[in-house]
């Protein structure tokens, strides 16, 4: 850790043994720091049969990685364009790093913070983006049928073959919001699908079929629970699998420096019929900056709609 924090411009060559705890440490540092570049080389050495080297890393924790490993390099991921917030810039950099891989991603953030928009930005080259809210699945049967699909005659009402959401998202991204609402049974089945082969293909099976279908899609999960709360609600193995690449999205009350930008973005995206200019009254902006906005973008949207109605009303009154 000391080496990486003091030698930021060096392209290291790292020698590790395959399958060891050292390897896991290296990949954790790689995924969390983004300091390492494509010039960093990992070389597999001999297979170490002894236990002694592994013992040095038994107490290693992700939390020990210093924050100064996270570089200030630019990012191609711009959900928060021209942000002045360090926490939002970190979201951009993390997403930029993760979408270059085929790994699943977990978005953690409060309601109304725009998790679906961030997930949508992870889609490459106009490929498919499929989304579902896990809270909408009434029971396990519906959840399984929606996710994995079914064959004709698999159950009462199955009048024809139907693709599941996983197949629909083949080649693209499947976004599952409120993942904490999935039952343990569905988590177990989904966990099996997450076990990909060497080519990063998933194997899924429709209800009523004996045939496995290979697909390739990225799963982006989202929750408004904290990580500790989520851990209590998910199967341990499923939890361990989906928290490997976590992106924490800051609430609007923690990104005051971007409040004007957020206001302008919300206003422009509402598509008012008369297309009024974005209000930039000093008193209004100062007031907006004082708001906590616990509903995040939804609260800001309500304010914009309310303001537009009464601004137009006042303008029309002046003309009378």
Describe every region a protein language model picked out.
Residues 1-13, 37, 316:
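A broadly used, surface-exposed interaction patch
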Residues 6-8, 33-42, 125-126, 272-275:
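Structural alpha-beta junctions
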Residues 11-72:
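Interdomain "pre-motor" coupling segment immediately N-terminal to P-loop NTPase/helicase cores
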Residues 76-156, 172-173, 178-180, 251-256:
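Conserved post-Walker A coupling segment in P-loop NTPases
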Residues 100, 118, 123-126, 207-218, ...:
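Nucleotide-binding/hydrolysis machinery
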Residues 139-145, 161-200, 217-221, 227-240, ...:
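Conserved AAA+/SF3 P-loop NTPase catalytic/coupling segment centered on the Walker-B
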Residues 154-160, 197-206:
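Short gly/ser/thr-rich secondary-structure transition/capping motifs
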